[in-house]
A protein has these predicted regions:
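NAD(P)H-binding glycine-rich loop region in Rossmannoid oxidoreductase-like domains
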Residues: 29-92
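Amphipathic terminal alpha-helices
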Residues: 288-303
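N-terminal Rossmann NAD(P)H-binding glycine-rich loop of SDR-like oxidoreductase domains
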Residues: 3-23
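Conserved Rossmann-fold NAD(P)-dependent oxidoreductase catalytic core, especially the SDR/UDP-sugar
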Residues: 26, 81, 88-135
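Conserved beta-loop-beta element that borders a ligand/cofactor-binding pocket
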Residues: 143-167
Length: 303
């Protein structure tokens, strides 16, 4: 099928595009810069120039495609402290894409995050695909997409863990944590660091997007999760080894100062299961886990 992909030259997109092409699909990738356009063309995709603010352009591209994968997000706004603006832009873009697909039965695969499960108040057990919150940042877009199943769209949402890792990752949370460790001289965790974060390799996540596009039933929540939950102190220890800095506990009161915009997230306990997704899509993670990938060294050679 012909697939329109936003964020096609980004971290996840740079794995999703080859995954789609290798499976025999045609890809039209959204590019907002000359560099992004060149990268997409080199990968074998058709290029459509534009950005998330061009809502009419998004509608036109979605209408012309057989399916849509929405990966783009204004991460720069989030890093600059304008998270609400990034959330609003994502919801507007999602609604624009959806408006072109209603009543067609075409697939729309969009993106959310497992950290948003904290809005559902889940504690003491791994979050599952059946769990959801009534509202909140990114949750509103997620619930909107699930609701499209009743409006003639084969919609699904992929929840990514807070760390999606590989050599394709140049700006994700792993890089941020490494940068903080080097800047402060300490690889930190909050309190006793027993809270858990899930993770997935980029190439494994890309397969979830492709399989979701091809086969997920309308209204599916999918978990692209390989490591169900790694103690944050273990993540900090791996970063400490790679960066050559000591590992230390940071008090909850000092977390915002030490971890900057990540201060509100690093102490969250977010174990997440992908059992339902694996059975539904026939997907099995096949690439290295987070600690192995950090110990490989490429993050520290490039950071």
């Amino acid at each position: 099928m012909s697939v329109f992909v936003t964020g096609a030259s980004g971290h996840i997109g740079s794995a999703v595009v080859p995954e789609l092409l290798q499976a025999g699909h045609q890809v039209v990738g959204l590019a907002r810069s000359d560099a992004a356009a060149a990268a997409l063309a080199a990968a074998g995709a058709e290029v459509r120039r534009g950005d998330l603010d061009d809502l009419e352009g998004l509608r036109e591209a979605a209408a012309a495609a057989d399916g849509v994968i929405h990966l783009a997000f204004k991460h720069d706004l989030m890093r600059d402290g304008a998270f609400p603006d990034a959330i609003a832009a994502d919801l507007a873009a999602t609604q624009a894409l959806a408006s072109a697909l209603e009543g067609t039965g075409k697939p729309l695969v969009t993106t959310s995050g497992t950290l948003m499960l904290t809005f559902a108040g889940i504690t003491g057990r791994p979050g599952t695909e059946a769990d959801f919150a009534p509202g909140g940042p990114r949750v509103d877009a997620e619930n909107f997409v699930i609701g499209l199943a009743d409006r003639g769209v084969r919609s699904s949402i992929v929840r990514l863990p807070p760390i999606t890792h590989s050599s394709l990752d140049h700006h994700g949370f792993a890089h941020v944590l490494i940068g903080i460790a080097r800047q402060t001289g300490v690889s930190g965790y909050v309190a006793d660091g027993a809270n858990r974060w899930p993770s997935v390799h980029t190439l494994d996540a890309a397969r979830v997007y492709r399989l979701g596009l091809e086969a997920a039933p309308a209204g599916s929540r999918l978990h692209a999760v390989a490591d169900e939950g790694i103690r944050f102190r273990e993540i900090a220890a791996a970063i400490g080894r790679g960066a050559g800095v000591p590992v230390a506990s940071i008090s909850a009161a000092d977390a915002a100062t030490h971890f900057s915009f990540l201060g509100g997230f690093v102490g969250i306990d977010n174990p997440v299961s992908s059992e339902v997704t694996q059975k539904l899509l026939g997907w099995t993670p096949a690439h290295p886990g987070l600690i192995e990938d950090l110990d490989h060294g490429h993050y520290f050679a490039r950071n």
